[in-house]
Regions:
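Short, low-complexity N-terminal intrinsically disordered segments enriched in polar/charged residues
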Residues: 1-30, 34, 38
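Residue-identity detector for glycine
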Residues: 2, 14, 18, 45-48, ...
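Exposed alpha-helical structural elements
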Residues: 7, 31, 51, 131-134
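Hydrophobic alpha-helical core bundles mediating ligand binding, dimerization, or RNAP-core interactions
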Residues: 12-19, 36, 52, 56, ...
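A solvent-exposed, acidic/Ser-Thr-rich amphipathic alpha-helical stretch
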Residues: 25-83
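A beta-strand edge to alpha-helix "cap/lid" segment located at domain peripheries
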Residues: 60-141
């Protein structure tokens, strides 16, 4: 069965909600198994869903909420380009710590069950050095 534009759009919409709400919570994180392939690769040079999950849990005091602004879906090549805003929110107060724009490029695959999965993620950050440095400060703890 061929993958449709609507399937990819719905998959990505669910993904952004899931990442923002579930991926960074230890008891909810594996809800994201429906989005990430077990061997997902990242442009940062690491791979594997479990490794990515550990990274997502490495900042328990703040939440990373990702909101898509524009999606460009290529059905034929199973790719999605997304302009997103990432907002880092302090969990205890709800205070916004940082917002940064990103362009994310998702390569998708279809697993043995016929389900879409993200198999590769490349992220390109906004070219504001101050925002990038602040983001890295929060990521490093």
């Amino acid at each position: 069965m061929a993958v449709t534009y609507e399937q990819i759009r719905n998959f990505m919409q669910g993904y952004f909600i899931g990442y923002s709400e579930d991926c960074q919570l230890p008891d909810r994180q594996h809800v994201m198994d429906k989005y990430y392939s077990p061997d997902i690769a990242f442009d940062a040079g690491f791979s594997g869903r479990d490794f990515w999950y550990r990274i997502c849990l490495s900042h328990p005091t703040w939440q990373d909420k990702v909101e898509p602004k524009r999606l460009c879906i290529d059905v034929e090549n199973l790719t999605v380009s997304a302009m997103v805003t990432a907002t880092f929110i302090e969990r205890s107060t709800g205070r916004i710590l940082q917002q940064i724009g990103m362009n994310a490029f998702y390569s998708l695959s279809v697993d043995d069950r016929g389900d879409l999965k993200i198999s590769r993620l490349d992220v390109f950050l906004e070219s504001n050095l101050e925002k990038v440095q602040t983001m890295m400060k929060y990521l490093r703890g």
